[in-house]
Amino acid sequence: MAVNIAILGFGTVGTGLPTLLSENKEKLAKILDEEIVISKVLMRDNKAIEKARSQGFNYDFVLNLDDILADSEISIVVELMGRIEPAKTYITQAIEAGKNVVTANKDLLAVHGVELRSLAQKHHVALYYEAAVAGGIPILRTLANSFSSDKITHLLGILNGTSNFMMTKMSEEGWTYDESLAKAQELGYAESDPTNDVDGIDASYKLAILSEFAFGMTLAPDDIAKSGLRSIQKTDVEIAQQFGYVLKLTGEINEVDSGIFAEVSPTFLPKSHPLASVNGVMNAVFIESEGIGDSVFYGAGAGQKPTATSVLADIVRIVKRVKDGTIGKSFNEYARSTSLANPHDIENKYYFSVETPDSTGQLLLLVELFTSENVSFEQVLQQKGNGKRAVVVIISHKINRVQLSAIQDKLNQEKDFKLLNRFKVLGD
């Protein structure tokens, strides 16, 4: 027998599926005792069809989703179009038509995941999306299965390959933000509009999905604090290294007694931290749990073959669940009420880069300002000034989010001081 699937969108990942099906044909046959067949492919227009055929692909290419929905032989629809629309509409229609769905669309899932999962359960079909987070790392299924008997207290990830590539260039080769972005765009890692990558939006979408699997809580995009790379200067990167850290864009979730706190931000990681050596476009997820302890999952965050492999794994899982009669079960079965942490309960050390007048007594004034909010210094570095302005760099002891906000407000209100940058610092 054959399992017939349809693909919506035949770009980088979509064109990688046929190769994987061919390379793993024998293994898949032994696992499933069935063959997975690409029955139809939805294309954008006739020009796209001609291009695909010129590349040697001879599938039943269609321009109308109804051709797929009306085909009773097709049991799985694989959405690889990206963006929220028309993907949301197409997935909704596929679910309502009784089709199981696989998608790699993190943007869609972060914004409309609750609605789509509810619809899938209503129609007793599967909605799987392993490839939506850290494409080549099977992190979602690992969280759903291997950590089902464990309590996760902390998750830290490098979740965006583009920003990690840029930070690697800035850290290892001394490039500026603009230079590293230009190279990322030249290599095709970053879009012409890099907003989602450099402002932490892409990573926040992935973090929202990870929250559901690791903590059982659904986060709206606005529940996640976000800051990106645009303000980072070469001096920030150099000072991080001087103090024994590496600067990375991370996504982090902490659970405390009052709830969870999620944030995407540039972070000073100790050079000894497992994620400090994750470079280039690679992704990694670091997990602290009460049972297992510390775990690290590392792999490609994107790319044709890694992402297509995760997509195919979802297809295989659906076929197996259909055979054993458990297809109606949710991809993630761990859910509880969402509780956001009290900002008084979230503590970290912080790096502050502050521009001051280059005159006697300014450091003392800065100390007094921080002391007024009960913030003490772990490390201080006063850089050589130009006679008019100087820069003071501070790493604080641990402070909570309320203290952090108060310090930032006071610095911004002081006419003689200018807060250049503020980054989270991990480590004891």
From Swiss-Prot:
<keyword id="KW-0915">Sodium</keyword>
<dbReference type="GO" id="GO:0050661">
    <property type="term" value="F:NADP binding"/>
</dbReference>
<feature type="binding site">
    <location>
        <position position="106"/>
    </location>
    <ligand>
        <name>NADPH</name>
    </ligand>
</feature>
<feature type="binding site">
    <location>
        <position position="13"/>
    </location>
    <ligand>
        <name>NADP(+)</name>
    </ligand>
</feature>
<dbReference type="InterPro" id="IPR001342">
    <property type="entry name" value="HDH_cat"/>
</dbReference>
<dbReference type="Pfam" id="PF00742">
    <property type="entry name" value="Homoserine_dh"/>
</dbReference>
<keyword id="KW-0791">Threonine biosynthesis</keyword>
<keyword id="KW-0521">NADP</keyword>
<feature type="binding site">
    <location>
        <position position="44"/>
    </location>
    <ligand>
        <name>NADP(+)</name>
    </ligand>
</feature>
<keyword id="KW-0520">NAD</keyword>
<comment type="function">
    <text>Catalyzes the conversion of L-aspartate-beta-semialdehyde (L-Asa) to L-homoserine (L-Hse), the third step in the biosynthesis of threonine and methionine from aspartate.</text>
</comment>
<feature type="binding site">
    <location>
        <position position="191"/>
    </location>
    <ligand>
        <name>L-homoserine</name>
    </ligand>
</feature>
<dbReference type="InterPro" id="IPR016204">
    <property type="entry name" value="HDH"/>
</dbReference>
<dbReference type="InterPro" id="IPR019811">
    <property type="entry name" value="HDH_CS"/>
</dbReference>
<keyword id="KW-0560">Oxidoreductase</keyword>
<dbReference type="Pfam" id="PF03447">
    <property type="entry name" value="NAD_binding_3"/>
</dbReference>
<feature type="binding site">
    <location>
        <position position="10"/>
    </location>
    <ligand>
        <name>NADPH</name>
    </ligand>
</feature>
<keyword id="KW-0028">Amino-acid biosynthesis</keyword>
<feature type="binding site">
    <location>
        <position position="133"/>
    </location>
    <ligand>
        <name>Na(+)</name>
    </ligand>
</feature>
<comment type="pathway">
    <text>Amino-acid biosynthesis; L-threonine biosynthesis; L-threonine from L-aspartate: step 3/5.</text>
</comment>
<feature type="active site" description="Proton donor">
    <location>
        <position position="206"/>
    </location>
</feature>
<dbReference type="GO" id="GO:0070403">
    <property type="term" value="F:NAD+ binding"/>
</dbReference>
<comment type="similarity">
    <text>Belongs to the homoserine dehydrogenase family.</text>
</comment>
<dbReference type="InterPro" id="IPR005106">
    <property type="entry name" value="Asp/hSer_DH_NAD-bd"/>
</dbReference>
<feature type="binding site">
    <location>
        <position position="303"/>
    </location>
    <ligand>
        <name>NADPH</name>
    </ligand>
</feature>
<dbReference type="GO" id="GO:0009088">
    <property type="term" value="P:threonine biosynthetic process"/>
</dbReference>
<feature type="binding site">
    <location>
        <position position="137"/>
    </location>
    <ligand>
        <name>Na(+)</name>
    </ligand>
</feature>
<dbReference type="GO" id="GO:0046872">
    <property type="term" value="F:metal ion binding"/>
</dbReference>
<feature type="binding site">
    <location>
        <position position="130"/>
    </location>
    <ligand>
        <name>Na(+)</name>
    </ligand>
</feature>
<feature type="binding site">
    <location>
        <position position="106"/>
    </location>
    <ligand>
        <name>NADP(+)</name>
    </ligand>
</feature>
<comment type="pathway">
    <text>Amino-acid biosynthesis; L-methionine biosynthesis via de novo pathway; L-homoserine from L-aspartate: step 3/3.</text>
</comment>
<feature type="binding site">
    <location>
        <position position="13"/>
    </location>
    <ligand>
        <name>NAD(+)</name>
    </ligand>
</feature>
<feature type="binding site">
    <location>
        <position position="188"/>
    </location>
    <ligand>
        <name>NADP(+)</name>
    </ligand>
</feature>
<protein>
    <recommendedName>
        <fullName>Homoserine dehydrogenase</fullName>
        <ecNumber>1.1.1.3</ecNumber>
    </recommendedName>
</protein>
<feature type="binding site">
    <location>
        <position position="12"/>
    </location>
    <ligand>
        <name>NADPH</name>
    </ligand>
</feature>
<feature type="domain" description="ACT">
    <location>
        <begin position="351"/>
        <end position="425"/>
    </location>
</feature>
<feature type="binding site">
    <location>
        <position position="202"/>
    </location>
    <ligand>
        <name>L-homoserine</name>
    </ligand>
</feature>
<feature type="binding site">
    <location>
        <position position="303"/>
    </location>
    <ligand>
        <name>NADP(+)</name>
    </ligand>
</feature>
<dbReference type="InterPro" id="IPR002912">
    <property type="entry name" value="ACT_dom"/>
</dbReference>
<dbReference type="GO" id="GO:0009086">
    <property type="term" value="P:methionine biosynthetic process"/>
</dbReference>
<keyword id="KW-0486">Methionine biosynthesis</keyword>
<feature type="binding site">
    <location>
        <position position="191"/>
    </location>
    <ligand>
        <name>NADP(+)</name>
    </ligand>
</feature>
